[in-house]
Regions:
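Extracellular/periplasmic, surface-exposed regions of secreted and cell-surface proteins
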Residues: 1-145, 210, 269-341
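Glycine-rich, aromatic-lined ligand/substrate-binding cores of catalytic
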Residues: 194-227
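Extracytoplasmic gating/loop element in the C-terminal half of outer-membrane beta-barrel translocons
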Residues: 219-303
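Flexible glycine-rich, low-complexity coil/linker segments exposed to the extracellular/periplasmic environment
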Residues: 1-23, 137-194, 241-268
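A short local loop/turn or secondary-structure capping micro-motif enriched for an aromatic residue
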Residues: 60-61, 179-181, 193, 223-225, ...
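C-terminal extracellular loops and terminal segments
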Residues: 78-87, 129-154, 191-206, 234-238, ...
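Short acidic/glycine-rich loop or secondary-structure boundary segments that cap or lie
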Residues: 119-121, 169, 173, 185, ...
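Short, surface-exposed charged micro-motifs
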Residues: 39-41, 161, 173, 204
Length: 341
């Protein structure tokens, strides 16, 4: 069996880690993908404008994922196995332009856009009480908020539809049922909202003037959703203190008014659209130094400059779509020197 150093035992005042067996699938296979695509490269005005257009279709077999298993059937409550098949189709478009090109000036601009549609077409194993496979664990006790379901996108969120009062405030413990009624029954449903974006955007531009150069690059993703587990796990008003002007209640906790956890409420499902400015750099090149063949380039740069998003958490760029224990991306300032001789 596969083992990991996850168990620990206490002897005296010290804890010692040891290996314990974990579940595995002895019949697991490699995930395979067949891809078909057609593309076109183009250029105009002596390649002052150029780029490409591609259309692709992909069929993935033996799709790998970690899913819950029935208690007592293995050494673990989850296992990595082949769950089914998936289709992808999409369009990739890229355009580059040189708007200015003179003796002293040069300006280049690049833009790429991708649209992608994915769908689960077959499931090898399904849960006994429903036609889907659960995934997206939010705790070590089997709680999940995502599913793989035939006809739906991968990592579709599976939550209860929160009920709201006339003022738009969520009603604790009340959910909208499939027939439109409101009750305390926590009926979960496939939200048709996935952790995977439907489109991606990339951008870069560079401006040079004599020995100076300035560059910006960024990227974005749209159509994806993020389950804010950090908020769902902590925004419980009963654990805070409210003593008049001395209150430690978070604003969002006060807005919801929840006294208890509502982990399966789609109140905590948010749009994950974002655009991030990844890098900005400014450089200067000193040419013909010393013997005339040497050069020195100095560059001042900033990484992770800014993120534009409506998401309330720290970072909307989370592949799993579950905001849980995400380490913040640092903003990095750098000064570099490159000497050639």
């Amino acid at each position: 069996t596969v083992s990991y150093p996850e168990s620990c035992y206490q002897f005296g005042d010290k804890w010692y880690y040891t290996y314990r067996p974990n579940g595995y699938d002895s019949d697991i296979k490699w995930e395979t993908t067949e891809t078909y695509n057609i593309g076109l490269d183009y250029g105009f005005l002596n390649n002052r404008i150029y780029g490409s257009v591609d259309y692709y279709q992909r069929h993935t077999k033996d799709l790998l994922n970690t899913i819950n298993v029935i208690s007592g059937t293995n050494y673990s409550s989850v296992i990595t196995t082949n769950i089914g098949e998936m289709d992808n189709k999409g369009v990739e478009f890229a355009i580059n332009a040189v708007p200015i090109h003179t003796k002293n000036w040069k300006w280049t601009v690049g833009l790429n856009y991708t649209w992608n549609d994915s769908e689960i077409t077959k499931l090898n194993v399904i849960d006994s009480d429903a036609n889907f496979v659960q995934t997206g664990a939010i705790s070590g006790t089997g709680k999940t908020v995502q599913v793989f379901m035939v006809g739906q996108r991968p990592y579709t969120f599976y939550l209860a539809k929160q009920a709201y009062d006339d003022n738009g405030k969520p009603i604790e413990g009340q959910y909208v049922q499939p027939d439109g009624s409101i009750s305390a029954t926590e009926t979960k449903y496939a939200t048709n909202k996935s952790a995977l974006p439907t489109s991606y955007l990339g951008f870069n531009t560079q401006l040079t003037y004599k020995n100076w150069d300035f560059a910006i690059s960024g990227h974005g993703a749209f159509g994806n959703y993020v389950y804010n587990y950090v908020a769902a796990d902590q925004y419980v008003q009963s654990v805070y203190s409210d003593q008049g002007n001395f209150s430690n209640i978070l604003r969002r906790t006060k807005d919801s008014g929840f006294q208890n956890q509502q982990l399966y409420s789609d109140y905590f499902l948010e749009k994950g659209n974002f655009f991030r400015i990844d890098n900005i750099s400014l450089g200067y090149t000193f040419q013909k130094l010393w013997n005339g063949s040497s050069s020195l380039r100095l560059t001042l740069g900033v990484q992770n400059v800014a993120t534009f998003t409506g998401y309330s958490g720290i970072d909307p760029e989370i592949y799993s779509g579950i905001d849980k224990e995400v380490y913040p991306r640092p903003r990095v300032f750098s000064l570099s020197a490159n000497l050639n001789f």
